[in-house]
């Protein structure tokens, strides 16, 4: 995919960069049997309380049912389309399997229309194939990695991301995740060979506030311009500093660098190195 530059004929188009499909392979019309309704929760829970701020609005979407489990074991499939998915920054592929079933998977970088993929323990180490970590050599680049066997891929699913298999010992394998975290994973977990496609997505520049609203993201108001009743940073005369030793969240917890992970979690024993930004 290529990066498209906009001329500054309007303020919104100035400095705007989008990922364009110059090859014409990205399709926007989904498979009808693989879509379902999608209700925007606007960051609210079942009681209507805001649990995730700055969410709401955005364009109406249909959810594409992605096969993160790669459930068609031992049956080869052919890549028919590469499609745009409004629910994620990675593209998706429509796969036609030999038994006639159709499924969506994440688009592995380098896979083209007409290529053949397969999943299962006997799959070869080729881009797009899915197999257990125990059957992969060290140094393999992987994505869509399972945490629990059979639950479906949960790690390294964003556009352009990939994990790396760096060690095996006993029943566990060691992998380096895109965040820099080094984690132990069961060797029975499934992963897909290769990197997620659309690697140029991190170079995208939206260009205007309206583009952010199309994605369902609302404006973020700084706490220092609020009233004291609304935020710990609020209040004061004019442009006053926050008046605290360190920045705080609206609920009084440490912000901007403070640890937010709970202590005494089961997965603490599986994490050998924390993320770079934690």
Swiss-Prot record:
> What keywords tag this UniProt record?
Chloroplast, Plastid, Ribonucleoprotein, Ribosomal protein
Task: Offer a single GO CC term for the protein.
Answer: mitochondrial large ribosomal subunit
Broad class of the protein's primary localization? plastid
Cystine pairs annotated here are none
GO BP terms in the entry: mitochondrial translation
The record's section on Gene3D superfamilies has: 2.30.30.30, Nucleic acid-binding proteins, Ribosomal protein L2, domain 3
> What is annotated about its quaternary structure and interactions?
Part of the 50S ribosomal subunit.
Q: What is this protein called?
A: Large ribosomal subunit protein uL2c
What gene is it encoded by? rpl2
């Amino acid at each position: 995919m290529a990066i498209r530059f906009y001329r500054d004929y309007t303020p919104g188009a100035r400095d705007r960069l989008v990922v364009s499909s110059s090859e014409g392979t990205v399709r926007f019309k989904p498979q009808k049997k693989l879509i379902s309704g999608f209700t925007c929760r606007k960051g609210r829970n079942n009681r209507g309380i805001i649990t995730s701020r700055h969410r709401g609005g955005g364009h109406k979407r249909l959810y594409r049912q992605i096969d993160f489990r790669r459930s068609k074991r031992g049956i080869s499939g052919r890549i028919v389309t590469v499609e745009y998915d409004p629910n994620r920054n990675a593209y998706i592929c429509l796969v036609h399997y030999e038994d006639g079933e159709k499924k969506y998977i994440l688009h592995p970088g380098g896979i083209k229309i007409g290529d053949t993929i397969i999943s299962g323990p006997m799959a070869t180490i080729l881009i797009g194939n899915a197999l257990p970590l125990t059957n992969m050599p060290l140094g393999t680049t992987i994505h869509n990695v399972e945490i629990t066997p059979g639950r479906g891929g949960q790690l390294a699913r964003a556009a352009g991301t990939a994990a790396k298999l760096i060690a095996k010992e006993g029943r566990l394998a060691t992998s380096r995740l895109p965040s820099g975290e080094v984690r132990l994973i069961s060797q029975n977990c499934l992963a897909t060979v290769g990197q997620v496609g659309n690697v140029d997505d991190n170079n995208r520049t939206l260009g205007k506030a309206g583009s952010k609203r199309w994605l369902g993201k609302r404006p973020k108001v700084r706490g220092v311009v609020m009233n004291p009743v609304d935020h710990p940073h609020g209040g004061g005369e004019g442009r006053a500093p926050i008046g605290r030793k360190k920045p705080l969240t609206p609920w009084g917890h440490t912000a901007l660098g403070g640890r937010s992970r709970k202590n005494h979690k089961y997965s603490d024993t599986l994490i050998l190195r924390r993320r770079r930004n934690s």
